[in-house]
UniProtKB/Swiss-Prot annotation:
It comes from Syntrophobacter fumaroxidans (strain DSM 10017 / MPOB). The keyword Translocase applies. NDH-1 is composed of 14 different subunits. Subunits NuoA, H, J, K, L, M, N constitute the membrane sector of the complex. The keyword Ion transport does not apply. The gene is nuoH2. It is an enzyme of class 7 (translocase). It catalyses: a quinone + NADH + 5 H(+)(in) = a quinol + NAD(+) + 4 H(+)(out). One of its GO terms (molecular function) is NADH dehydrogenase activity. It is found in: Cell inner membrane. Disulfide bonds: none annotated. It is a multi-pass membrane protein. Keywords: Cell inner membrane, Cell membrane, Membrane, NAD, Quinone, Translocase, Transmembrane, Transmembrane helix, Ubiquinone. The chain crosses the membrane at residues 6-26, 79-99, 120-140, 155-175, 193-213, 242-262, 271-291, 310-330. This is NADH-quinone oxidoreductase subunit H 2. PROSITE patterns: COMPLEX1_ND1_1, COMPLEX1_ND1_2. The lineage of its organism: Bacteria, Pseudomonadati, Thermodesulfobacteriota, Syntrophobacteria, Syntrophobacterales.
């Protein structure tokens, strides 16, 4: 009974810490992105709220909380109100399987530095990321707006299309690590990160994941010059904030998965494992921000052609090459 109680308390503590860090980092990723883009465009960026604009995320949160929460006339009220929560919740729940370091011993208990050490962690990731499609599609449909509906349809088609190349990019990593567990995959990279043996899979995964979370240059579902704000055109206040939160938590999820699958996870010299993982996540986030400030938005036909005609065939070829290499190494 005592062990069960202690295990439950440890789980609650891990959930609380991970959730708090995710929300805090998401808020300051917005600040980092605005500052980084400002420098790229020879501007100052946020500099009014606090020193260097560091209080700007808090000011933004207060503003969104104070905004009126409106529901458009003719909207499907229940679905309209639930859709942002689906997007934010799926993004937050995916982080449960990302490991932060090796097991630690505390008060005589062996505690894994991961919320849920599943032996099918990658399948869990794909299951939850697939559910995120419903939040986008239903939010667009329930808004009773043509702009929102078109954005929702685009978002659903884009996310479903790029899930294929995303999944195929991970197959070579699983073949090398011989496991679906993210902890096992990190441990398999103790000698060298998989980016050295799987550069093609790394490139396909990063491009597909950016399309999956609808970041520029793949933000067709919310293209401002065509659709207003796409599937969240009719949202205001904290419901709009939940869509925003989902995007920036997804940036952290993408950074965590890239670090775990290709960059060696928590492995690194001198610094603690958790610090190494955090550095790698921030590095991936900075690359995404740099891409946003550098590349123009694709046309919708270019977006679909890239996924179906380039990434998926390339991923299939990479799987065959990796399979032959793993088979040869096994012999």
């Amino acid at each position: 009974m005592l062990n069960w109680t202690a295990g439950f308390l440890v789980l609650i503590a891990k959930l609380t810490i991970v959730l708090a860090v995710l929300l805090l980092v998401a808020a300051y990723l917005v600040w980092l992105e605005r500052k980084f883009l400002a420098r790229l465009q020879i501007r100052y960026g946020p500099n009014r709220a606090g020193k260097f604009g560091l209080l700007q995320p808090i000011a933004d949160i207060v503003k969104m909380v104070a905004k009126e929460d409106t529901v458009p006339e003719g909207a499907e009220r229940t679905i309209f109100m639930l859709a942002p929560a689906v997007v934010a919740a799926t993004a937050l729940l995916v982080f449960a399987v990302i490991p932060f370091g090796k097991d630690v011993t505390l008060w005589g208990m062996k505690i894994p530095l991961v919320v849920a050490d599943l032996n099918v962690g990658l399948l869990y990731f794909f299951a939850l990321s697939s559910l995120g499609v419903y939040g986008v599609a239903l939010g667009g449909w329930a808004s009773n707006s043509k702009y929102s509906l078109l954005g929702g349809i685009r978002g659903a088609a884009q996310m479903i299309s790029y899930e294929l190349s995303l999944g195929l990019a991970i197959v070579p990593v699983v073949m090398q690590a011989r496991s679906f567990s993210l902890v096992d995959i990190v441990q398999a990279q103790e000698k060298y990160p998989f980016i050295l043996t799987q550069p093609v899979a790394f490139a396909i995964f990063v491009i597909s994941a950016m399309a999956e979370i609808k970041r520029i240059p793949f933000d067709l579902p919310e293209a401002e010059n065509e659709l207003g704000a796409g599937f969240h055109t009719e949202y205001s206040g904290m419901r709009f904030g939940l869509f925003f939160l989902g995007e920036y938590v997804n940036m952290q999820v993408l950074g965590g998965l890239v670090a775990v699958l290709f960059l060696g996870g928590w492995h690194g010299p001198l610094l603690p494992p958790v610090v190494w993982l955090f550095i790698k996540i921030v590095l991936v986030a900075l690359i995404m921000i740099w891409v946003r400030g550098t590349l123009p938005r694709l046309r919708y036909d270019q977006l679909m052609a890239l996924g179906w005609k380039v990434l998926i065939p390339l991923a299939l070829v990479n799987i065959m090459v990796t399979g032959a290499w793993v088979l040869w190494m096994g012999k």
